[in-house]
């Protein structure tokens, strides 16, 4: 597994996982070399203690028990636990990193992780506990705990003791051979796995935002020059060009967008004050510029996540080619932490854009087209989308607060051995929350746009792209004339948005 598409197919589509023969060779050579090399040398985590206790030599007869002690003592997570897709992603990332043959781990550990994925056995891993350097020690300890046959897992929808599930499916717990405890725990695999999951949903959010933005431009019969190739190619940013091109593609068959030359360049206007807007509001007109920055950020973040996913994030690093063991800090999560902070900022930007577009639709003083709150009932007696706007505004505000960076919130710990840490897992977890919030706001926007389409009676004039998602939404959420309890519809719309397939 070397690219993001493979990651998605395994994590979300339950594609079976196997260790390639070349990887098996590298894994075995690395293990055999380290086992021989470490016999008369001081190797961190093999014959020493860990962290600030590394100055203590561990007797040969205690070295295997040391690994069990590490796993059990660091299985100390708390709070909520990660969902199945995040844990699968974390297992896959750890498996992939250790398969590079740079960790001196026994192949049994890697094969057992493959078995967890293939049997859809999900270890119980808690959200709280990771500081992002020495990797995701606490969270990955819970993975290692399951691999040695202890702890708890989710299997077939139930939370159960690992030992019971292993017995049921015929798996044997991992036996420690050399340094499997440290190698399983000492890396960035939870934050990287969650980062990959976050990216999966970030792509969906971006595509939906482009679709909703184009739909609103249709509703208000915008001029098409603000997403034209000529205007957007005048700037050098790839993302802006891609978003503008996507808007043109989506709107190619729309009967509602207009050419400025047909209306404002005719020389027929003699008014001093124009009743019609000469230019659309920024939330409609500046979509390529706003979402272009989001597009480029997501693309860059995906590259960094792919690189980390295919990196040996362990310590020490075993190099068979030079016959050496190198001690350093490849477990440090700075790359992922920084990228997750950037990703949550641009997802919050998506949320802010959606909230402003929603406000535009709900306020007749600025859209000059729709009834207040897109109310299809009796004004004053019915409320339309008034109630859900509060939810959208509140959720957007929460995202704005959550977008403060984790990357700069290092707190020294481990007797100051870890005197600067990445907080990468916290960053990825907060980003996950921001993404979930964004889906809630976009669900409200989607329902509101659909209401506006029905009120205007313009369905037949819309682009095929807008009609397609409108039809999909209407299978879940009806046209609302009378006041209804809204929260079930919001959840249905959110589920629809999250389940959509993404193709850029």
What are these regions (language model features)?
Residues 44-58, 62-66, 73-98, 126-148, ...:
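FAD-binding core of FAD-dependent oxidoreductases
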Residues 1-15, 19-26, 30-33, 37, ...:
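C-terminal auxiliary extensions adjacent to catalytic cores
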Residues 1-40, 65-126, 217, 230-233:
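Glycine-rich, flexible loop motifs
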Residues 42-45, 501:
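An N-terminal domain-start capping segment
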Residues 92, 100-122, 129-140, 145, ...:
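Well-ordered mid-protein domain cores that form the structural environment of catalytic cofactors
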Residues 73, 93-97, 112-123, 128, ...:
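Mid-sequence acidic-hydrophobic segments that form the walls
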């Amino acid at each position: 597994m070397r690219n993001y598409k493979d990651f998605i197919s395994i994590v979300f589509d339950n594609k079976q996982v196997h260790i390639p023969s070349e990887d098996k060779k590298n894994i075995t050579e690395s293990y055999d070399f380290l086992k021989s090399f470490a016999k008369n040398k001081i190797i961190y985590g093999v014959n020493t203690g860990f962290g600030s206790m590394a100055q203590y030599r561990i007797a040969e007869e205690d070295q295997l028990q040391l690994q069990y002690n590490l796993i059990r003592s660091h299985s100390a997570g708390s709070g909520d636990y990660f969902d199945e897709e995040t844990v699968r992603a974390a297992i896959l990332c750890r498996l992939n990193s250790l398969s590079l043959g740079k960790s001196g781990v026994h192949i049994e550990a890697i094969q057992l992780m493959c078995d967890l994925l293939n049997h859809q056995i999900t270890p119980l891993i808690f959200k709280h506990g990771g500081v992002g350097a020495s990797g995701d020690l606490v969270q990955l300890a819970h993975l290692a705990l399951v691999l040695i046959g202890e702890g708890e897992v989710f299997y077939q929808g139930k939370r159960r003791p690992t030992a019971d599930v292993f017995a049921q499916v015929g798996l044997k717990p991992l036996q420690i051979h050399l340094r499997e405890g440290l190698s399983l725990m000492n890396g960035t695999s939870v934050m990287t796995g969650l980062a990959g999951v976050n990216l999966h949903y970030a792509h969906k959010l971006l595509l939906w935002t482009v679709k909703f933005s184009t739909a609103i431009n249709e509703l208000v019969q915008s001029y098409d020059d603000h997403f034209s190739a000529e205007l957007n190619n005048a700037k050098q940013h790839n993302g802006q060009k891609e978003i503008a091109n996507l808007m043109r593609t989506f709107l190619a068959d729309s009967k509602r967008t207009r050419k400025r030359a047909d209306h404002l360049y005719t020389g027929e206007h003699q008014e001093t004050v124009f009743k019609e807007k000469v230019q659309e509001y920024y939330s409609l007109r500046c979509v390529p510029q706003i979402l272009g920055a989001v597009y480029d950020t997501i693309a860059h973040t995906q590259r960094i996540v792919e690189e980390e996913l295919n990196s040996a994030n362990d310590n020490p690093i075993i190099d068979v080619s030079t016959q050496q063991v190198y001690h350093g800090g490849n477990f440090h999560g700075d790359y992922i932490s920084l990228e997750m902070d950037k990703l949550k900022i641009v997802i919050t930007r998506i949320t802010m854009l959606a909230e402003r577009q929603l406000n535009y639709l709900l306020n007749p003083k600025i859209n000059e087209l729709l009834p207040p709150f897109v109310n299809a009932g009796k004004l004053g007696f019915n409320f339309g989308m008034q109630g859900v706007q509060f939810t959208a505004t509140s959720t957007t505000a929460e995202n704005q607060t959550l977008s403060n960076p984790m990357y700069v919130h290092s707190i020294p710990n481990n007797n100051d051995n870890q005197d600067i840490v990445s907080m990468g897992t916290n960053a990825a977890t907060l980003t996950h929350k921001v993404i979930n919030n964004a889906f809630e706001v976009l669900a409200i926007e989607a329902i509101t746009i659909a209401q506006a389409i029905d009120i205007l009676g313009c369905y037949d004039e819309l682009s095929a792209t807008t009609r397609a998602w409108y039809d999909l939404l209407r299978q879940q959420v009806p046209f609302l004339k009378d006041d209804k309890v809204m929260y079930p519809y919001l959840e249905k719309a959110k589920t629809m948005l999250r389940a959509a397939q993404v193709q850029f």
